[in-house]
Amino acid sequence: MADLQKIVDDLSALTVLEAAELAKLLEEKWGVSAAAAVAVAAPGAGGAAAAPAEEKTEFTVVLASAGDKKIEVIKEVRAITGLGLKEAKDLVEGAPKPVKEGVNKDEAEKIKGQLEKAGAKVELK
């Protein structure tokens, strides 16, 4: 049981980029695709009788582009995510990329405002 707790602690300490890399490695190792699992878990097409769509409660903040002030955007990404300089630079240069996932609407709007103030183009998904 202590081994499982250590794994949980180690996974919790990963940055967003490290978690994404881990997901890719596990997909390759196990021969699966995370996208396929999401498609299977998604509800089937329901037609008009489906329940009304609920308001989204979790958002992903996606950096669409860094704009002209790339250095300012990198600084803001570091402040928001806690990433190191190289990881933040790679994230910004690899746009479009998710900056923060699974955040509530208020936090997503706040992060979007911070990044846009720094000169980035941002989307909420």
UniProtKB/Swiss-Prot annotation:
Pfam families: Ribosomal_L12, Ribosomal_L12_N. The keyword Ribonucleoprotein applies. Keywords: Ribonucleoprotein, Ribosomal protein. GO terms for cellular component: cytosolic large ribosomal subunit. The keyword Ribosomal protein applies. One of its GO terms (biological process) is translation. One of its GO terms (molecular function) is mRNA binding. InterPro entries: Ribosomal_bL12, Ribosomal_bL12_C, Ribosomal_bL12_C/ClpS-like, Ribosomal_bL12_oligo, Ribosomal_bL12_oligo_N_sf. Signal peptide: none annotated. SUPFAM superfamilies: ClpS-like (SSF54736), Ribosomal protein L7/12, oligomerisation (N-terminal) domain (SSF48300). Homodimer. Part of the ribosomal stalk of the 50S ribosomal subunit. Forms a multimeric L10(L12)X complex, where L10 forms an elongated spine to which 2 to 4 L12 dimers bind in a sequential fashion. Binds GTP-bound translation factors. NCBIfam families: L12. Belongs to the bacterial ribosomal protein bL12 family. Forms part of the ribosomal stalk which helps the ribosome interact with GTP-bound translation factors. Is thus essential for accurate translation. PANTHER family: 39S RIBOSOMAL PROTEIN L12 (PTHR45987), LARGE RIBOSOMAL SUBUNIT PROTEIN BL12M (PTHR45987:SF4). This is Large ribosomal subunit protein bL12. It comes from Bradyrhizobium sp. (strain BTAi1 / ATCC BAA-1182).
